[in-house]
């Protein structure tokens, strides 16, 4: 029987097992702020490593970059963020609650059975008309008395240096992409890459969201994994399809079920004026379908804007054809926190065992699991041998060492945090140099030589 997966269960497990804690908790917390605990930081790092492995290490096209969070203000003027990076904001006059008008509309669409609920690209007038026509009341107080819809810029503003004036004004970056665009020429020249090629980056971004929520799904501080793939104009739709398929298969290969994913291609009315195509990979979260991965064909918009604003030549000269052009860009953009949450939800399970006992187990792909194995001596008299095994294997893998409690309880603890293998050291180990290794998913056990453990674990990490 399928287990009911709720956000309450996921949040409780994350907090109780050290995946994610509420931020600033001893001071009463900070709304929508989360800290990754000992298991969470290992897990999230594994998610990032998996992405980097497939999108940089194993790709002949792509190279990496780590650009600064703080950039010249003119970067954001050129990109359009200073003038247009905003959400439609409205307040309830009765209870003073604040909402994104487009999210009120989309929630209403979802509640009324719309297969695709989106108000992307709607004007303030369209949003207001829909809210009034459908009598959408305030979710907090049930009244319908709103302020006019206005634009709210999502960037966090700060100042550089000791003076707070227009010259020292700057922003925390709302996306990592612009750092890639402004480094396009430098990366292309030094890496000697020819179009088509991509620049990948993992890094923190910040958005002053009006209505963050759903745990780590939407937060004001978040981490992105973005690729900007530069291609020749006219080949962009072909590359857009290539990266759509590549991203989809990345998720499937890490144990996300296809039935919990859908590919949604944006209609013409949703597309940005500069985009030839945009597609979202959506995941079925406990609270409904939510965007996981955006794959956008941004044409030459970004490089052209920076070329125009900076006065620098950002075109590319094809040495073979002697043709000069501004490359088009395909952008697969993924939130590390959001996809990590999806992996946790996908992995969560409750299994009823013989005798009515229930075990909570996280069926994480071994490549993502915080610990690849746990070393479990049956007796503290076996600690020395167990620590020797730990010392050798820990050179290759992140391991847990647990010698307290019954072996059954220790198995359950490891199941709940997603550890793929439990390695039991018993008194026979001292004689035959063998251990018992238990599989998390099947709970089956087998006896193998200590010398075979490394290859045994390593084989399961491939994807």
Curated annotation (Swiss-Prot):
One GO molecular-function entry: protein dimerization activity
Keyword terms: Aminoacyl-tRNA synthetase, ATP-binding, Cytoplasm, Ligase, Nucleotide-binding, Protein biosynthesis
GO BP term (any one): glycyl-tRNA aminoacylation
E.C. number: 6.1.1.14
Reaction it catalyzes: tRNA(Gly) + glycine + ATP = glycyl-tRNA(Gly) + AMP + diphosphate
Keyword Nucleotide-binding appears in the UniProt entry: yes
InterPro entries: aa-tRNA-synt_IIb, aa-tRNA-synth_II, aa-tRNA-synth_II/BPL/LPL, Anticodon-bd, Anticodon-bd_dom_sf, Gly-tRNA_synthase/POLG2, Gly_tRNA_ligase_bac, GlyRS-like_core
Protein role: Catalyzes the attachment of glycine to tRNA(Gly).
Subunit structure: Homodimer.
Protein name, as recorded: Glycine--tRNA ligase
Biological classification of the source: Bacteria, Bacillati, Bacillota, Clostridia, Eubacteriales
Gene that this polypeptide is encoded by: glyQS
């Amino acid at each position: 029987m399928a287990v009911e997966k709720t956000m309450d269960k996921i949040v409780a497990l994350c907090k109780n097992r050290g995946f994610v804690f509420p931020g600033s908790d001893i001071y009463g917390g900070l709304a929508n702020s989360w800290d990754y605990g000992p298991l969470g930081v290992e897990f999230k790092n594994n998610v990032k490593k998996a992405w980097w492995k497939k999108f940089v290490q194993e790709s002949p096209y792509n190279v990496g970059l780590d650009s600064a969070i703080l950039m010249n203000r003119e970067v954001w003027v050129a990109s359009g963020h200073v003038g247009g990076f905003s959400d439609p904001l409205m307040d309830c006059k009765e209870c003073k609650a604040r909402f994104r008008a487009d999210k009120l509309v989309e929630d209403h669409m979802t509640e009324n059975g719309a297969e695709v609920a989106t108000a992307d690209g709607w004007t303030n007038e369209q949003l207001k008309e829909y809210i009034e026509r459908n009598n959408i009341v305030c979710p907090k107080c049930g009244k319908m008395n709103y302020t006019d819809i206005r634009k709210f810029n999502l960037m966090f503003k700060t100042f550089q240096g000791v003076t707070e004036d227009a010259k020292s004004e700057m922003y925390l970056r709302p996306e990592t992409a612009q750092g890639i665009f402004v480094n396009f020429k430098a990366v292309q020249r030094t890496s000697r890459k020819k179009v088509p090629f991509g620049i990948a980056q993992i890094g923190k971004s910040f958005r002053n969201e009006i209505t963050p929520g759903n745990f780590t799904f939407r937060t004001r501080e978040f981490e992105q994994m973005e690729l900007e793939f530069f291609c020749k104009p006219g080949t962009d739709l072909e590359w857009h399809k290539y990266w759509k398929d590549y991203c989809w298969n990345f998720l499937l290969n890490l144990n996300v079920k296809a039935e919990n994913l859908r590919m949604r291609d944006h209609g013409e009315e949703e597309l940005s004026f500069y985009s030839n195509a945009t597609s979202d990979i959506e995941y079925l979260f406990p609270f409904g379908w939510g965007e996981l991965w955006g794959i956008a064909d941004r044409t030459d918009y970004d490089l052209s804007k920076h070329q125009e604003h900076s006065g620098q030549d950002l075109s590319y000269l094809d040495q073979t054809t002697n043709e000069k052009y501004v490359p088009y860009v395909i952008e697969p953009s993924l939130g590390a926190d959001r996809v990590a949450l999806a992996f946790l939800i996908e992995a969560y399970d409750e299994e009823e065992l013989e005798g009515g006992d229930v075990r909570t187990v996280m069926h994480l792909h071994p490549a993502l699991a915080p610990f690849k194995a746990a070393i479990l001596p049956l007796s503290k008299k076996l600690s020395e041998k167990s620590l020797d095994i730990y010392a050798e294997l820990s050179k290759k893998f992140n391991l847990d060492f647990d010698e307290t409690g019954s072996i059954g309880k220790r198995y359950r603890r490891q199941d709940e945090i997603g550890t793929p293998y439990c390695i039991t050291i018993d008194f026979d180990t001292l004689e035959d140099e063998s251990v018992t290794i238990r599989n998390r998913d099947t709970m089956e056990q087998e006896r193998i030589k200590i010398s075979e453990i490394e290859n045994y674990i390593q084989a399961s990490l491939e994807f």
